[in-house]
Design a protein with these regions (language model features):
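Short periplasmic/luminal acceptor-recognition loop of GT-C membrane glycosyltransferases, typified by
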Residues: 12-118, 125-128, 132-139, 144-150
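Short, charged/polar, Gly/Pro-enriched secondary-structure boundary elements
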Residues: 152-155
């Protein structure tokens, strides 16, 4: 490899390292930054969740890295699950029929009333842990965070 190629490779490596170093700064206020989301909600949690369940919402699968937990998505209505896969793992009613497992339920503000109705219909008691308000963003991006009675019972 000639001197020009060596300089080109060195510049390319510097560019790659620079982009890698700048990415966290550029993503700092990004709503899809799972690390920031996890850091924001950790103080609300009554313990370590075994499952984070997104109700009629986009899941943030990166939370499994920062909370060391399983991520699920549920819908209000049962939806057929094709062989290949489905956008939702189950319905809210199916999830609520499962035994307590230190679950968190996260949803957009506009889904909160439907979630509460579904939980109450199942005979369970919802417990609001808090709200995640995304900084400097419209309120339609706020997320409500719930658990259920006896989900985080002391062992």
């Amino acid at each position: 490899i000639g001197p020009a190629a060596q300089i080109g490779i060195a510049l390319w490596l510097l560019l790659l390292l620079g982009v890698k170093g700048l990415a966290p700064i550029l993503l700092e206020n990004n709503s899809k930054d799972s690390r920031a989301f996890a850091d924001d909600i950790k103080p609300m949690l009554p313990g370590h969740p075994n499952q984070v369940i997104f109700v009629e919402d986009m899941s943030r699968n990166g939370l499994n890295l920062y909370l060391q937990t399983n991520i699920k998505k549920v819908s209000f209505e049962p939806r057929p699950k094709p062989i290949s896969d489905s956008a939702f793992d189950s319905s809210l009613a199916q999830e609520l029929a499962q035994p307590a497992d230190q679950r968190l339920f996260i949803m957009k503000r506009e889904m909160e009333q439907a979630f509460l109705a579904g939980v109450q219909a199942s005979g369970r008691t919802p417990r609001k842990l808090g709200e995640w308000i995304e900084k400097e963003k419209p309120s339609d991006r706020d997320r409500m965070i719930y658990t259920l009675d006896n989900e985080f019972a002391t062992r």
